[in-house]
A protein has these predicted regions:
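Short amphipathic alpha-helix with an adjacent loop that forms part of the alpha/beta core around
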Residues: 55-62, 240-248
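N-terminal phosphate/diphosphate-binding loop that engages ATP/GTP or pyrophosphate donors
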Residues: 11, 18-73
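Conserved catalytic-core segment of NTP-binding enzymes
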Residues: 79-95, 100, 106-218, 231-235, ...
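A generic structural motif
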Residues: 32-33, 217-229
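N-terminal glycine-/serine-/threonine-rich phosphate-binding loop
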Residues: 1-17
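General beta-strand structural signal in soluble alpha/beta enzymes
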Residues: 4, 28-32, 70-73, 101-105, ...
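Feature captures the catalytic cores and cofactor-binding loops of soluble hydro-lyases/lyases
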Residues: 4, 12, 36, 84-87, ...
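Short, ordered loop/turn segments at secondary-structure junctions
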Residues: 7-8, 33-36, 106-107, 135, ...
Length: 250
């Protein structure tokens, strides 16, 4: 399973990766351990709460479509889908080994940057890869709750004062800090950073500067909405087995 954590485009990246994998012939299950917005492009949604046999429900859906969204139940008050428990995801991934599971494991209140609270992220098991997403549009914004989710925790991780601007060093600190974006990520799990919204002015320069300060993981920058990315670190291309062209990682 692959988990997406952080802020600034997790859901968009998840669905973009899913489309790419489905186009390549894979069977893909998009899901969450928290809450997500329903897909906008007509992907089938499988509701597991109350299902007599959740494994059969997902299996049958994948037999009819290469990519599906698995969720607990609709949440009409917030126009989202409720998540699936890590325990159920373990059951599903074991029973459906041919499927690729993409799991949004974090919430960010639609902010471009965050630090996890004590109960976050809600990671599934077994976890093979964890992708931390940061929004490059956060750079230059003040570290306050109007612009950053859990800004006090970001300040603590980055050693900055409240209200000070987000910098590339802030992003690097969130990646490297033990209580940062990869909090509770298991040993042996591959760790990648996707710096999203790289189409903005100066965004790729900011991402490159952050990657240079954070050498323990592979960094990519790009635009999930536009469907491209570039590797920023020497290990990034090797980590994802991709050529250095403007495309989403697989």
């Amino acid at each position: 399973m692959t988990a997406l954590v952080g802020a600034g485009g997790k859901t968009t990246l998840m669905y973009a990766l899913a489309r790419r994998m489905a186009d390549a012939g894979r069977r893909v299950v998009c899901t969450t351990t928290t809450k997500i917005f329903p897909p906008e492009d007509g992907l089938p949604v499988v509701l597991l709460e109350g299902a007599a046999d959740p494994v059969a429900a997902v299996h049958d859906a994948l037999s009819a479509a290469p990519c599906v969204v698995a969720a607990g139940r609709p949440l009409p008050d917030v126009r989202k889908l409720d998540g699936v428990s890590p325990r159920m995801l373990a059951v599903l991934s074991t029973a459906l080994p041919e499927a690729l599971f993409l799991v949004e494991a974090d919430g960010a209140a639609r902010k471009p940057l965050k630090a996890p609270a004590a109960h976050e992220p809600v990671l599934p098991e077994p976890l093979g890869c964890c992708v931390a997403v940061v929004g490059l549009d956060s750079v230059g914004q003040p570290l306050d709750d109007g612009h950053v989710h859990r800004s006090a925790l970001v300040c603590a991780a980055a050693g900055q004062e409240p209200g000070s601007p987000v910098t590339p060093a802030t992003l690097a600190c969130l990646v490297e800090h033990p209580e940062g974006l990869f909090r509770n990520c298991p040993a042996g799990c591959r760790r990648l950073v996707f710096a999203n919204k790289g189409d903005g002015p100066g965004a790729l320069d900011a991402a490159s500067e952050a990657a240079a300060l954070s050498r323990s993981v592979a960094w990519f920058a790009g635009s999930a909405a536009q469907g491209w990315c570039v590797p920023l670190t020497a290990g990034a291309q090797r980590a994802l087995g991709m050529e250095p062209f403007r495309d989403l990682p697989c």
